[in-house]
A protein has these predicted regions:
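Short proline/glycine-enriched turn/loop motifs at strand-loop junctions of beta-rich domains
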Residues: 20-27, 55
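Alpha-helical scaffolding segments of alpha/beta enzyme cores, especially the outer helices
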Residues: 130, 179-182
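The feature marks proteins involved in alpha-glucan
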Residues: 1-16, 37, 42-123, 134
Length: 185
């Protein structure tokens, strides 16, 4: 197996959901909401792209060589868990209020390592954001989140992540992570 192809970056295609499948002879995009199966277009170095952009919020899965539905391994949103279809998430629509934040010196800072699932009874990023004042009152200067990548089930430490770019849905998904980051700054 060649190692040079996997280092090739994904083609810049925007919301056309590229996937790297160098051994596949055919890759289809399955859209569960309509049942549509769309053949993807082969690109160089083993990349495949959908023939048209997908709107934000569209659920999709890949089928390699006529096989079962597979989630996007680079998905940012897995609303039905790590084995379910992926959903298009457009981070450009997020609203940020932390433009004035300029950071702080790490030297002498009190850093709190936060596990989202156990920090509050709800176990969500939104609930954790509501408790940031509590941490500040304890003298905490910075929060370091333990891994938030998608994993099977509801409870985990995050080190067994499956969808490394997707925020665990039980924590609130990618939009909740953005709200938490905004609140923390």
């Amino acid at each position: 197996m060649s190692t040079s192809s996997w280092r090739s970056p994904a083609p810049p295609v925007g919301p056309r959901v590229p996937v790297w499948a160098p051994q596949a002879a055919r890759v289809d995009l399955h859209l569960p909401a309509t049942g549509e199966v769309v053949p993807m277009e082969a690109r160089e170095h083993g990349w495949w792209v959908s023939p048209r952009p997908l709107p934000t919020g569209t659920d999709y899965a890949y089928r390699l060589d006529g096989g079962d539905d597979l989630p996007d391994p680079r998905s940012a949103w897995q609303p039905d868990g790590v084995h379910g279809p992926s959903r298009v998430f457009d981070a450009s629509h997020l609203t940020w209020t932390d433009d004035g934040w300029r950071g702080r010196d790490l030297l002498g800072a009190v850093i709190y390592e936060l596990h989202v699932g156990t920090f509050t009874p709800e176990g969500t990023l939104d609930a954790a954001a509501r408790r940031l004042d509590h941490l500040t009152g304890l003298g905490v200067d910075m929060v370091e989140l333990m891994p938030v990548a998608g994993f099977p089930g509801r409870a985990g430490w995050g080190y067994d992540g499956v969808d490394l770019w997707a925020v665990h849905e039980a924590y609130g998904g990618p939009a909740a992570l953005a709200r938490f980051v905004d609140a923390a700054h």
